[in-house]
């Protein structure tokens, strides 16, 4: 606001933009993804003026994503490069492991270029996660509030409990 250099004041329009949690910033392919108030965004979209819809990768699951964001109070993420996946986890201290949620965004090659398909994770309580390669083997590790370090993508149980899984395809005409 103001009419001259002497009285000009720069004021924020909103603080409800940008990255919500630094632990959600990940390099995916040749772009950078992060959790924003309206969903998962691509950093490259900030360079494209007026590209508001394409910037929100999670737009196709917006109602589910809004519920995911409102239910959590701490978010972290990791990338599984071998599967082209961005995994986002919600952690609320003191809640049961069975109530913990996560979202997997998998980058797929579609007819119109790269697209993201989403799925939901339930029952993996993640406070911090990371992935890295050692001699062509990708390791995905995470920790939670119990003080232990766990390895994802290994085995067929989670700490001795069977992993429940449901697979559903889109409705076909």
What do these predicted ranges mean?
Residues 1-14:
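Surface-exposed extracellular loop regions of Gram-negative outer-membrane beta-barrel proteins
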Residues 16-22, 27-31, 37-173:
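Beta-sheet repeat architectures centered on beta-propellers
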């Amino acid at each position: 606001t103001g009419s001259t250099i002497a009285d000009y004041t720069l004021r924020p329009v909103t603080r409800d933009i940008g990255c919500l949690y630094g632990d959600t910033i990940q390099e995916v392919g040749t772009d950078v993804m992060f959790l924003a108030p309206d969903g998962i965004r691509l950093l490259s979209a900030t360079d494209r003026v007026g590209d508001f819809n394409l910037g929100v990768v999670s737009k196709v699951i917006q109602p589910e994503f809004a519920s995911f964001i409102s239910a959590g109070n701490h978010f972290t993420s990791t990338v599984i490069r071998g599967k082209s996946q961005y995994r986002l986890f919600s952690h609320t201290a003191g809640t049961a492991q069975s109530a913990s949620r996560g979202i997997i965004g998998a980058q797929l090659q579609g007819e119109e270029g790269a697209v993201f398909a989403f799925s939901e994770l339930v029952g993996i309580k993640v406070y911090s996660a990371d992935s890295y390669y050692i001699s062509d083997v990708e390791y995905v590790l995470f920790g939670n509030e119990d003080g232990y370090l766990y390895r994802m993508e290994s085995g067929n149980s989670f700490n001795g409990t069977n992993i429940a899984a449901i697979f559903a395809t889109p409705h076909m005409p």
